[in-house]
Amino acid sequence: MTQRTLGGTVRKRKRTSGFRARMRTKSGQNVIKARRRKGRARLTV
């Protein structure tokens, strides 16, 4: 019996939480700003 792994899809992930998706909305831009302020190595996925 094969196991179902919850892999996820790259395209879906990029489209919902990628950099350009974040920059599209004001609140998303705030997320990027907050992560920059905090000094995160990775801003988005």
UniProtKB/Swiss-Prot annotation:
A cellular-component GO term for this protein: ribonucleoprotein complex
Record's compositionally biased regions (Basic residues): 33-45
Record-level Gene Ontology MF annotations: structural constituent of ribosome
Matching InterPro entries: Ribosomal_bL34, Ribosomal_bL34_CS
Swiss-Prot/TrEMBL keywords: Ribonucleoprotein, Ribosomal protein
Domain of life: Bacteria
Region (Disordered) location: 22-45
GO BP term, example: translation
Family recorded in the similarity comment: Belongs to the bacterial ribosomal protein bL34 family.
HAMAP family according to UniProt: Ribosomal_bL34
Name this polypeptide is given: Large ribosomal subunit protein bL34
Gene that encodes it: rpmH
